[in-house]
Amino acid sequence: EAEMCGNGIRCVGKFVYDKKLTDKTLVTIETKAGIKTLKLNVKDKEVDTVRVDMGIPILESEKIPVITVEKIVQNLKLNVLDKSFNFTCVSMGNPHAVTIVDNISDFDVKKYGSILEVNEVFPNKTNVEFVEIKDPENIKMRVWERGAGETLACGTGACASVVACNLNGLTKRRVNVELLGGNLNIELGEDNHVYMTGPAVTVFEGELNNPKVLKLTR
C-alpha cells in the first residue's frame, strides 16, 4: 500500500463529484500522507481536470528516508551495472529518487530502475524518476514505481521531479511534465506547497459480484 498516489487522488475527486457524492468543487481527501485539498474544474457538469495541493515536499534524508550523512540528498552518486547516476531525493509522502538522463526515449528504465528501487541506501525502497530536460519549463519523465515497475505516469513522481530539477537550478517554478500517459502541470507555490494539475477521465464502469473479492473490501 502506497502512502499517496497523485493520479489516484485526481480520479477519486472526479468520482465523488460525477457520482454526486458531493456538489462541492473544493474537497479534501485523507491519505496516509496527510489530508490533501482538491480544486475540481468542471466542464459540462463533469470534472475535467483537478488541481491538487500536494503539500510541502520533504527534503531531509532521514525523513524520506535515505541512508546518508547528508541532511539534504542533492548529489547522491550510485553506480549500477555500467552506469553512474547522480540523484536528488524527495518525499511527497512517498520516497522518490530523481536523476537526469540525456535521452529518455531510448533509456532502459527496467534495467536500471529495478536495481535502484531496492538499493540498500533506500530502507523503504524508492520510486525512481528518470528525467530529460527539454527547457526550463518543460521536462520529460519516465518512472519506475516501487513495487509496480514502469508505469505510464506517476503524479507524486512528477511533483518530486520538478522539485528536484528546481532545486538544482534546471527548471522554473511552473513546469509541464510529459509522461507516457499524458501531461501534468506542476507548480511550486510561494507557500512552498507543490500544486499538481492534470486530467481525470472515466475509462470504464462495471459491477463486481465475486463474494471472495467483496469479502476483502469489507
Where are these predicted regions, by residue range?
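Active-site proximal loop and beta-alpha junction motif in alpha/beta enzyme cores
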Residues: E1-M4, I9-T151, V163-R218
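Helical hairpin unit composed of two closely spaced alpha helices linked by a short loop
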Residues: T156-C159
